From Swiss-Prot:
It is found in: Cytoplasm. PANTHER family: CALBINDIN, SECRETAGOGIN. This is Secretagogin. GO terms for cellular component: cytosol; dendrite; nucleus; synapse; terminal bouton. The lineage of its organism: Eukaryota, Metazoa, Chordata, Craniata, Vertebrata. The gene is scgn. Ca(2+) 3 binds at D158, N160, D162, R164, D169. GO terms for molecular function: calcium ion binding.
Length: 272
């Protein structure tokens, strides 16, 4: 393996690949190959001078090893197999086949399978979890491929070998989008800016467009809020903070957080 790729992880590799494989057909072709390898080298060695000779050297090495059909193009799986460690490679392939939209969608699925709020999902539950996830994205996965994904996940992420995965494990596996709340800096904003940001935030989590956060919408908001101050949270932590949020914000005790209630909790005056 070339030293240029020693520190590359799946997230970084995927971001670069998607930039060049614009039509998402699983190939990088022609001049794109030169641009692709040049970009990767610049990303990984920002202080080094990237010469045409170095680019062609890397390109030749990859093409001779993986372009078995001599058609002048490479597949993402071939590159991943060569330059990524096993764990990151698996994450890469999985992310391409089943991207999740946001934390609300993730929590809808989590709540369906963690029905007892234990904070864990067993191997059997995981298999059903994946099946529904692929159906949600209108993808038909053969039984053998479903078994392969399930087994691989348990082997990689079930570190203590107790046959179950926690909330944080699945959040990483399913590659949730970057925390939506990271783009906002409420403390440093004026009242006008805070109100504007609040509208964006509420609209993002109010997926059902009912004017209130309920069920997985509350879960998704709580998850992102907690992760602003605590990068790794458990299912139990989420449930405790969710209960706390409802206690303080759900003024009419209907199990939902109305837009006006959340605004009040955040120190904003909301006009219906």
């Amino acid at each position: 393996m070339d030293s240029a790729f020693a520190n590359l992880d799946a997230a970084g590799f995927l971001q670069i690949w998607q930039h060049f494989d614009a039509d998402d057909n699983g190939y990088i072709e022609g001049k794109e190959l030169d641009d692709f390898f040049r970009h990767m080298l610049k990303k990984l060695q920002p202080k080094d001078k990237i010469t045409d000779e170095r680019v062609q050297q890397i390109k030749k090495s990859f093409m001779s090893a993986y372009d078995a059909t001599f058609d002048g193009r490479l597949q993402i799986e071939e590159l991943a197999n060569m330059i990524l460690p096993q764990e990151e490679n698996f994450l890469l392939i999985f992310r391409r086949e089943a991207p999740l939209d946001n934390s609300v969608e993730f929590m809808k699925i989590w709540r369906k399978y963690d029905a007892d709020s234990s904070g864990y999902i067993s191997a059997a539950e995981l298999k059903n979890f994946l099946k529904d996830l692929f159906l949600q994205h209108k993808k038909k996965i053969p039984p053998n491929k479903l078994d392969e994904y399930t087994d691989a996940m348990m082997k990689i992420f079930d570190k203590n070998k107790d046959g179950r995965l926690d909330l944080n494990d699945l959040a990483r596996i399913l590659a949730l989008q970057e925390n939506f709340l990271l783009q906002f800096k409420m403390d440093a904003s004026s009242q006008v800016e805070r109100k504007r940001d609040f509208e964006k935030i509420f609209a993002h989590y109010d997926v059902s467009r009912t004017g209130a956060l309920e069920g997985p919408e509350v879960d998704g908001f709580v998850k992102d809020m907690m992760e602003l101050v605590r990068p790794s949270i458990s299912g139990g932590d989420l449930d405790k903070f969710r209960e706390c949020l409802l206690t303080h914000c759900d003024m009419n005790k209907d199990g939902k957080i109305q837009k006006s209630e959340l605004a009040l909790c955040l120190g904003l005056k909301h006009k219906p």
